């Protein structure tokens, strides 16, 4: 299954609407939602052609779960409906909303939307885990017999949804989870990096790296940045890992 993190608005892009509806300037006018959906359609076709036997084609389904936010849920859903789900089967496109948290000022004060009402904002990509459980998405995956999950963010126009190579590698190595990274183009590139803290892998935001840490070099096969593996929000999970390790904790 593919899980798309699409709770954000296009505000920083100068666009008033869900980020996935943003036109990135292609000659086709395709939006991010359109690109990702069309790639899944093509992947389904390729998988179907590859695994048919004796002239009988195999039914291939790759469900797309889209995590929205309360701010863009209805608009996102309507956009897919009005575009006939970009060729995907409607029953295989599932929308669910992440939670919200109170907005705080830099001094830790709760901000108000209006008198007696807290200003709220989506709870970030990490909100996917409680949202999957509360919305019934995890149960739906189990009911469908899904074992392998590819999760990625909407603002990656080059993403390969349900990436066969990435998922296949994780299956081959019997990984519970995986994280695809890109190497930083510059020591001070504004991107979080994969690191190790107290013996456990973690993501460190660029704002938390000192100048010395950002520029530190280590010798592997050749000199390279010690903190150069940029996190691009591109993850693999086995369903058992989510059920038994992530959700309970």
Where are these regions (language model features)?
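Domain-scale recognition of functional cores that engage charged ligands
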Residues: 1-4, 11-249
């Amino acid at each position: 299954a593919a899980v798309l993190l699409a709770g954000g608005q296009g505000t920083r892009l100068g666009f008033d609407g869900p980020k996935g509806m943003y036109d990135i300037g292609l000659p086709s006018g395709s939006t991010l939602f359109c690109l990702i959906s069309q790639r899944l359609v093509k992947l389904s076709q390729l998988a179907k052609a590859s695994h048919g036997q004796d002239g009988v084609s195999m039914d291939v389904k790759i469900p797309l779960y889209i995590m929205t936010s309360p701010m863009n849920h209805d608009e996102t859903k309507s956009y897919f409906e009005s575009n006939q789900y970009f060729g995907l089967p409607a029953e295989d496109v599932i929308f669910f909303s992440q939670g919200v948290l109170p907005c705080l000022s830099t001094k830790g004060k709760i901000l108000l939307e209006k008198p007696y009402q807290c200003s709220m904002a989506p709870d970030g990509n990490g909100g996917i885990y409680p949202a999957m459980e509360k919305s019934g998405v995890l149960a739906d995956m189990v009911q469908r017999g899904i074992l392998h999950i590819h999760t990625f963010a909407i603002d990656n126009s080059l993403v390969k949804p349900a990436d066969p190579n990435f998922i296949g590698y994780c299956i081959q190595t019997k990984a519970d989870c995986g994280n695809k990274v890109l190497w930083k183009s510059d020591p001070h590139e504004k991107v979080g990096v994969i690191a190790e803290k107290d013996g456990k892998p973690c993501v460190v935001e660029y704002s938390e790296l000192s100048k010395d840490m950002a520029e530190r070099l280590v010798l592997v096969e050749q000199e390279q940045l010690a903190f150069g593996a940029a996190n691009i929000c591109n993850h693999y999970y086995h369903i058992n890992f989510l059920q038994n390790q992530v959700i309970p904790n």
